[in-house]
Every structure is written in structure tokens, then in C-alpha cells.
Amino acid sequence: MRKKVDERIRTLIENGVKLRHRSMFVIIGDKARDQIVNLHHILSKSVVKSNPSVLWCYKNRLDISSHNKKRAKQLKKMKERGQLDPEKLDAFSLFLDVVDVTHCLYKDSERILGNTFGICILQDFEALTPNLLARTIETVEGGGLVVLLLQSLASLTSLCTMVMDVHDRFRTESHSEASGRFNERFLLSLASCKACVVMDDELNLLPLSSHIKSITKVPTKEDSEALSEAERDLKSLKDALNDDFPVGPLINKCCTLDQGKAVVTFFDAILDKTLRSIVALIASRGRGKSAALGLAVAGAVAAGYSNIYVTAPSPDNLKTVFEFVCKGFDALEYKEHLEYDVVRSVNPEFNKAIVRINIFKQHRQTIQYIQPHEHEKLSQVELLVIDEAAAIPLPVVKSLLGPYLVFLSSTVSGYEGTGRSLSLKLLQQLEEQSRAPVTGVEGSLSGCLFKKIELSESIRYASGDPIESWLNGLLCLDVANCLPNPACHPLPSQCDLYYVNRDTLFSYHKDSELFLQRMMALCVSSHYKNSPNDLQLLSDAPAHHLFVLLGPVDESKNQLPDILCVIQVCLEGQISRKSAEKSLREGHSPHGDQIPWKFCEQFRDVVFPKLSGARIVRIAVHPNAMKMGYGSAAVELLTRYFEGQLASISEGDDELEVEPSPVRVTEAAAKVSLLEEQIKPRANLPPLLVPLRDRRPERLHYIGVSFGLTLDLFRFWRKHKFAPFYISQIPSAVTGEHTCMLLKPLTLSNDEFEVDESDELGFFAPFYKDFRIRFSKLLSDKFKKMDYKLAMSVLNPKINFPEVDLTGNSPDGFLKKLDGVLSPYDMERFRAYTANLVDFNLVYDICKTLAHHYFQEKLPVSLSYVQASVLLCLGLQESDFSSIERQMQLERGQIYSLLLKVGKKLYKYLNGIATKELESTLPRLKDRVLEPHKVSVDEDLREGAKEVEEQMRARIEELLDPELLDQFAIGDKEAEALQKSKISSSGLISIESTKTDNKKEKPSGFDKSAKKRGNDKHSSTSNKKRRA
């Protein structure tokens, strides 16, 4: 049955066409696809030009194939099964055949950037992300339609509980329940969009779109050819410059007055040919920045510039730039293949993007793409174009600037990567230095001429577009003006940290929405690269939490307090041992839990993932409160909070438990039909800001952080006692920075681990020691180009030591033996170098060896910071002297002098070790230990005398024993013999023995006695001769 379309729908579309504003339709129902034909028909009748083109975006499958033959077979089968009404089937089939429909997968949505369509159809709502939403809606021209197709819903509030595809990335092992806060806020925001209609698949308007009940038609202009004031000014500009070559033909390609003025400004700088001139172009998304840059580059080629370099985060970002370079060449009547050639990349990652254009009409000219970190290739450049500079880190952008003409464009609000830091920091610095005298400015940017251009008028649609305002508010894109200056700057010690309740923050209440816009403005103005997807991560991810640092709050004033600092924290860890072992075995890490998985991978440790920790995702300080200590105060308060110093962890206070989840829209909505459902923001919400003393903290073992490694950021975190454990060896292709992760153990972890209480790193100390050794070994290869100041900060070596007594017991860990480190020949060469007898080249190998030992703190020798830096550059990074001169700004003679001082100090210590080793090999007298007597000398003498007297008395008694004296008695015969005997002249006396000899003498014995007598006789003779 035919049904008349609601007149308000037709009026909304016609008003959009007249005002060049876009309209949005949300169609709910299984037959929502059939209403696209009607909406397209209404739009076609309203516009004067040909049928509007259609962009159809989907997740992975279309209900009806986009291929003609496949679609015919598919429709035939559906008709036979009775799944389609023949009348509607013919209408939709005719629609697909007649209308120019571009089908695009969500994952391939980047290829539609820069294109323009009349209608954008989005199906598969569960696959949508904020980035996809902004990217696809941005392609619709003024007067066009945005159509969102939803499956049949019992109520609109069921969108809030819909499981989105992106939620899979938000879930972790310990946090598995993702919320639907973003969908709830999206649904509530539809009621505030004056150009949005929510209806069912029969085009019945739902109560959520009650705001269009009073819609009226916009009066039609009497003169359809009448131009707006901006269009008249653009026409006047084109007529004035029409005869000027080459700027005239290029201005004719411009669509808005802002774009035309930008091209004129670029061309003035080109013709001026002044070195050190910078022209910055900043605007929101869809203002024609890239097109203006492309036309300006074509003009530079016509003006005779030979070497032009173009850079962006990726060659895909330069698609529009190169496209308008070619359009500019067409306007200047350059012929492709005859006067210029286009070279495309063969790198599959660049998707055949244009990377080079060779021009050879007048002389050889080149337009070449380079990556942002390849600034060393800019030696011969005449013009450098930097597109999407907001997505490139500030240090990299600064390294690209030099004594040549620079065109720079930046997106200050959009969806590819926004950042006010470029305009707030770099552009402000350029403005200040352009006013300063050349002699009074230091650095590479001194004396530069600076111009800034801002584009406000959109290319595709007119100003005041309601869809743009709604999208900017929903995704917090244009929040630069939402950040007021702080009323005062209190002392950091007077500030307090508050926990932000996310249910209240994303409830779409007026005050909560203003607070959210200010928070996102702080994040955009920081050094982080921002994306609309970050908003959905903040709202739906179960492990993420928000904290804000506020000054003293005056409760008597009914106004929101000034936000000085925002901290986004992600809870990680509590991973089972089984999951950790599986990850190590398969070499794959799930989404989330960055620090635990990376720690597990680096140290092959399955215990650390079981610990619970918090990763600081971002910390953003108000741009007008930088360098005032607010960031440090926020980190200190957060650390104390998780250590239980602000709110007790161990106490079992029920009122301090995590607040219960409030009633959601889905629970608050009345159980009514879709056509009667009233959607309103929730009431009775908990407080937006919760003091930390009123909320129990999670029990954590550590706090971590991950960021792109820069010197200022690393020093900030090291100041707060965070220690690194991982630095990626491969720098980012976009930023040129190495990813760095740091940890800080909390005091609660010391209660669960056996650690040295004197070591502030606790259980993390051995891992940090291992990291330093690995990092020092990689400095000569993967980190060879790292700035020496950053390398010194990462290593954090101990360079001041007390005097070490080599003769005594030196502390453990110091080098005590030269065996295996330096040979005697090495020591002799080293001695000769310290005595100025040989050149440094002769001991360069020794320098590398000793550098590794010194930075492992095995050589307790005190060095100055400059001396240690030179030793690091030569010994660890193995840099040449030219590189050291350039980095440290020292003369070569000064470097040699520093090396000699270092050598003398190291040789003194090593020579002491060698001397000690030599002394240990020499023989030594045995040391006798003299102990004091236990008795005095007099007592010792008395005891000795007593012992001697007793011995003498016992001996006398033995001698006077009668039995012993009997052996000396003289017998009768002996007495008689003595009386009668006389000594003969020979002197021999014969005594007859009374004892009988029973043994017979042996002949051999006789011989021996004879021989003995002979010997005695000979001996007697010799003695007589000696006496004579």
C-alpha cells in the first residue's frame, strides 16, 4: 500500500538544499533499505544538477550484491522465495542500476578521503567508531543526506547495551565488561541536532525528533543566480588576477575566498624568494588546505623552483596535494608524459601513492616525497611543504625547518590526528622570533619571516551547517575555544586530585558536557596525538579511569572549577600464569595490558603479569599553566593515592567501596513502544567529582607509563622515580621516536616480595639492572643516532664515587681482577697513552672495553658529566669525532683533552688493581700470632722450679735404690785381680770373663771385625799424621 511521505521530511531536505546544509536520517527497521529510494528521489527533485552520487559503507557483507550479474541472480532468488515485494524489488534494483553508488568497506574508508558524495549510507551500526563516523560524514556535500540504517529495535535505548565491535579491544582478562556510555551519549545528542530525523522503516517520526514539528520552509531567493558576499568577493579576486600568470589560472581552481587568499599569500612568498620564510596554513577539516598547498606547489614549479620536497605522516595524506598539483599543471597547460611524469610508490604499505613528479618543460625540476624524520635529505631543498604537521611531533617538525622556504599546514580539529600543540607552541614561537632581531635570537629559527593563514569557510558545505556543529560537539572536535584561562594559578601544594565519575561525565547533562569539552580541550592542547576514537575509549573501556587536578574550590560559587591537569589511567595486570605461558609459547599478545605483556616478552617472566598495576595513558596540563609544577603534583598525588596514603586500602569500610553503577537510560525508560518512547538524560546521577579520600583505591603493585621517547618527557618521569625496562629498537616510521616504557614499584609491593629495603626500586631492581646492560650493548647499533643527553639519562650512570682503598676490601660489584679484561700488553699501551707517548687510535679498543665496564659501575672512578658523555659517545655509541663535535659543540682538541683526563683516572685505578694482583703472587712470611700468657711470670717461675725440684728428687731416689746399686758390686775374683794386676808396657789388660758364651762366632762376623780393626788402624795412622 502506498503511503504519503511526511511533509516535514521533504521540507528538511529542501531547506538543506537551499542553504547548502546537510541533513541526517536515522531509519530503524529491517526494511530501512527500501526507504533510501524515496529519500534519494526527494533529493533528486530538490537539486538542480544531476542525480546525487551515493556512498554506501558497510562492515563486511551487503544484503544485495554490488556486482550487477550477482545482484540479478540474488534478487531473482529472493523474489522466488517471497522475501521481497516485486514492486519494491524493481524500485531498488532500478535505483542501483541508475544511481552512481560507491560501495566501501569500513576498513577501507581511508580511500574515500577527498571525495564528495550527495548521500552517505551507513549500515552495520555495531561496526561504527567515532573516527569512521567523522570520516564518512565529512564526504557529504552541502544539501546532501547522511542516512544511518539500524536493525529492528524494541526500543531506542537498546542501542546503549549494543555490543560494539570495538569493545573487543577494550576487554582484558581482568576487565571484561565494556559499557555503552558512548552510544547513550550519541543517542541523546540526536535530539539536539536540528537537522536530524529519527524514524522507523515506514517513515514514521519518533518522539526523539519532536524538534522538527515546527519546521518551516526556507523562502526561495527571487534571483537564483544571486551570489553570497563571499562568492562575490571570490569572483572579484579571480577577475582581478585573471591576466596574471601563473597565479591567474591557479586562482580559478579555488572554491572559496579563504582558499583563494591562501594561494595568493603562498605565491607572494614564492616570488619573494627570501630564505628562512615560513607560511603556516591552519584550519579545521574540509577547508581545502591540501588543495591550496597543491596549487601553490604548481605555482612554485612555474616560478622556476627546482628542488621541492613534500612531507607528511604518510604518502596517503598527500593524495589531495599531488592531485591538485596535477590540476594546477593542467591549468598552466603542462602536458603529462610530454612535460612531466608522475611516479608512484612500489611499496605495498603506501598503496601506490604518488611519491615523485619529474618536470622537464623548462629545465629539470622535481617534486619529491620524504618521510618526516629524513631531514638530512634537505641539503639542496628550495621549497619544503609539510602537510598534516599536527600529526608529526614538534621536535621532528622543528628539525625540518631551515634556511629555505617552508609551507606548513595543520589540522587543528578533525579526525586524522588533531593537536593544538602545533599552533600553541611552534607557531607562537615562530611569531615571537619573527619579531625579534636576528642578532638576538638563537637557534635554527632565528630571523625567519613568518606568515599565518587561517581558513574558516568549508569547501563542501556552507557555514553554519548543523551536522558539522552536532558532529563537533559529539566527538569533541572543535574544542579549542572551550578552554578558558585559569582564574588564578594556585600553588601545587594547594591543589587536590579528584576522581571523575564517567557515568556522570558522559550523561549529556549541560554541566557535564561543558566539563567534558574542557577536558578534551586540555588533551588536544597537549603533546599527544588525538583521535575521536580516544573519546570512545574513555567512555566505554572498563579499565580506564580519569583524574583531574583542581585548585581550591569555592563551593559558594555556582560554576565549574578550572581544570589544571587531566590524567587518564588504565588498570592492567592480573593475568593468569596459563595465559602468560600461552603468550610466550605462541608469540602473540592480546589487546590491552601493554606493560604486563611487554614485560613478559622482554624478560620471559610469567610472574609479573599476575601483578596488578596502572598505566598512565596521558597526562595533560593546561597550556597556560605549563612549567608550574601541576603535572608533578598530579603524579605525586596519584602515587600516594594508590599507595593508600590518601584513602586506606586495608580497612574494610563498605562506604569506601567502588560506587555502584547508576541506573542507565535503558533501565529508566518506560516499557513503551518505539513510537511512544521518550528519551531523556538520566536523573539522580552521582557526583561528577569524587575526592580521593572518599574512594577506596585499587590495590596495585606498580605504576607504569608508555610514550614516545624524548629527553624532556624522560627526565620528567625519571624525576618521579620511574625506571625504564623497555625501549623499542625500531623507531616509529611516522614520528621517528622509540617507544619507551617505565615502571615505579609502589610501597605495597615490598610487603609481598623479599627485597632490599634500601633500594627504592624494590622488586624491579634486578630487571632494571638487566635493562641497562642490554641498552648499553645496543647503543652502538640500534641506538647509534640517539642524542647523547638522552642516552645518558636512560643509562643514568653513577659518575661520582668515594675514594676506594685498593689495599682493603672494596665493595662488591667493582672490578677486582684484570684477567679477561685487559692483558699486560693492553696495560702497557694504556700506560703509554696516559703518558702522552702514543695516539688515541692505539687504545681505541681499550676505550670501548672500559666504557662498558664503567657504565656498568664496575670502575669506581669519578668523572665529570662531560667526560662521561665523551666516553659514552666513543665507547658505547662508537661515534666518530665529527659527530661528537656536532652534538656536544666541542673542538676536537677539547675532546682529546677530555679523553686523556678520563684515561689517566681509569689507568690509576686499573694500575692499583694490577699492583694488588702482583703483590698477591709474591712469597710472604708466615704471620705468627702472639697471645698473652694466662699466668704471671712469677707464678710461671715458681711452678717451673717446683717441677724441676720434684724431678731432681725423683732421680736421686732412683739412684739410691738398693736393687739398682747391686749391679755395681765387686766380686771376689775381680778384687783379687785388681790387687795382683799390673799394667804391662804394652798397655793391654786381659780380664777373664766369668760369663760363658754359648754362641759361636761366625766367620763373616770375624771378617767384619777384622775389617773394622783394619779401618781403625788406618784411621789411627791418619790421626797420628794429622797430629804431627
From Swiss-Prot:
UniProt KW Transcription regulation keyword: no
Family membership noted in the UniProt record: Belongs to the RNA cytidine acetyltransferase family. NAT10 subfamily.
Pfam families found in the cross-reference section: GNAT_acetyltr_2, NAT10_TcmA_helicase, TmcA_N, tRNA_bind_2
Alphabetized GO MF terms: 18S rRNA cytidine N-acetyltransferase activity; ATP binding; tRNA N4-acetyltransferase activity
Record-listed ATP binding positions: 286-295, 460
Enzyme class label: transferase
Assigned keywords, A-Z: Acyltransferase, ATP-binding, Nucleotide-binding, Nucleus, rRNA processing, Transferase, tRNA processing
Keyword Phosphoprotein tagged: no
Biased composition range(s): Basic and acidic residues: 994-1009
Compartments in which it is found: Nucleus, Nucleolus
Location of region: Disordered: 989-1028
The N-acetyltransferase domain, residue ranges: 548-731
Primary location recorded for the protein, binned into one broad class: nucleus
Function: RNA cytidine acetyltransferase with specificity toward both 18S rRNA and tRNAs. Catalyzes the formation of N(4)-acetylcytidine (ac4C) in 18S rRNA. Required for early nucleolar cleavages of precursor rRNA at sites A0, A1 and A2 during 18S rRNA synthesis. Catalyzes the formation of ac4C in serine and leucine tRNAs. Requires a tRNA-binding adapter protein for full tRNA acetyltransferase activity but not for 18S rRNA acetylation.
HAMAP family registered for this protein in UniProt: RNA_acetyltr_Nat10
EC number in record: 2.3.1.-
InterPro entries, sorted: GNAT_dom (IPR000182), NAT10 (IPR033688), NAT10/TcmA_helicase (IPR007807), P-loop_NTPase (IPR027417), TmcA/NAT10/Kre33 (IPR032672), TmcA_N (IPR013562), tRNA_bind_dom (IPR027992)
Cleavable signal peptide: none
Protein name: RNA cytidine acetyltransferase 1
Catalytic activity reported: a cytidine in 18S rRNA + acetyl-CoA + ATP + H2O = an N(4)-acetylcytidine in 18S rRNA + ADP + phosphate + CoA + H(+); a cytidine in tRNA + acetyl-CoA + ATP + H2O = an N(4)-acetylcytidine in tRNA + ADP + phosphate + CoA + H(+)
Species this chain originates from: Arabidopsis thaliana
Gene Ontology CC annotations of this record: nucleolus
Domain of life, per lineage: Eukaryota
Binding site for acetyl-CoA: 619-621, 626-632, 719
UniProt GO BP: rRNA acetylation involved in maturation of SSU-rRNA; tRNA acetylation
